Amino acid sequence: MKVSLVKEQTVRNYANKHAEARASCVDFINRIKTADWEKPNNIKATFGSVDLLGKGTYRAVFDIGGNNHRFICKYRFGKRSVRLYVLWLGTHAEYTVLCDKEQQYTADNHEKYI
């Protein structure tokens, strides 16, 4: 199924604030635009370095820019398409702090980049 990236502009704004991640952010967007997913494991086929979080969160953590940045997105598989919602964007160091506090399951900072 076709994948739609919700809040694509948020990723672009993040890239503008983190120039070193710009090319990787564009690559992330382009991969999403050409993705064809039927189930969550297909996300791993598109992005080899992605972690699917458990606990019924329907969240995926994407490694961006050589593992220097992380994006947390929520995925929703519908009848005809998949929607990928950008929830959290940050550096690897910020993500580590998030995980130390076990907040990766609930984190949401995308408004910072709107």
Features from the language model and the residues they span:
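Basic, Lys/Arg-enriched alpha-helical interface segments
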Residues: 1-68, 77-83, 92-114
